[in-house]
Regions:
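A conserved nucleotide-sugar
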Residues: 3-44
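Aromatic "clamp/platform" in nucleotide-sugar-dependent glycosyltransferases that forms part
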Residues: 48, 67
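Short acidic/histidine- and often glycine-rich active-site loop of Leloir-type glycosyltransferases
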Residues: 77, 90-101, 105-106
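Conserved acidic donor-binding segment of nucleotide-sugar-dependent glycosyltransferases
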Residues: 99-111, 120-125
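Short hydrophobic beta-strand element within catalytic cores of glycosyltransferases
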Residues: 84-87
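A short, well-ordered alpha-helix in the C-terminal region of glycosyltransferases
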Residues: 120, 127-141
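Short acidic alpha-helix that forms the nucleotide-activated donor recognition element
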Residues: 28, 44, 50-59, 80, ...
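C-terminal alpha-helical cap of glycosyltransferases
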Residues: 144-159
Length: 159
């Protein structure tokens, strides 16, 4: 679905690059889809990386196009890094990004939804800044000191 959305954007002359990190059973499928759609100048399969943070840190935006997720560790890592995030509406994402998408851009769980999210970010640079700030705000929920203060405050409120 990500490749289909990217193919549509490329046909519209949008300028972007996608770097996919990781290994998995879909690799051959992805390679053939990239080749079939003539996307090898736009989409790069980087394979397993011992330290993916180097790549994530230089990314303008993080995209999770999953059909289904449990708790998405990689999406939470993107939030902690303050990356603007485009994620599909699947289990776990609203818990991570807020019910109303306060900390990330939650799209419809479809090719069109992924396309729509990417298109909006490509056409509106201000969204990158806005959602980077939202991600940084969301990352505070993972700060141990803030979590301890919240727990302490909640415990004291009971007395």
């Amino acid at each position: 679905r990500l490749i289909d959305a990217a193919t549509k954007l490329k046909k519209e002359n949008a300028k972007f690059k996608i770097y996919i990190i990781g290994e998995g059973p879909e690799k051959k499928n992805l390679e053939s889809q990239i080749e079939k759609n003539n996307m090898s100048d736009v989409i790069y399969l980087l394979g397993f990386k011992k330290n993916p943070y180097v790549y994530m840190n230089f990314a303008d935006v993080f995209i999770c196009s999953s059909r289904a997720e449990g708790f998405s560790t990689v999406a939470s890592e993107a939030v902690v890094l303050g990356k603007p995030c485009i994620v599909t509406d699947c289990s776990g994402m609203r818990e991570l990004f807020g019910e109303e998408g306060q900390y990330g851009f939650i799209t419809e769980n479809s090719t069109e939804g992924i396309y729509d999210g990417m298109d909006k970010f490509i056409k509106n640079n201000k969204m990158l800044t806005e959602y980077a700030e939202r991600a940084k705000e969301g990352a505070k929920r993972f700060d141990v000191n803030i979590a301890l203060k919240t727990i302490e405050r909640n415990l004291l409120d009971d007395f």
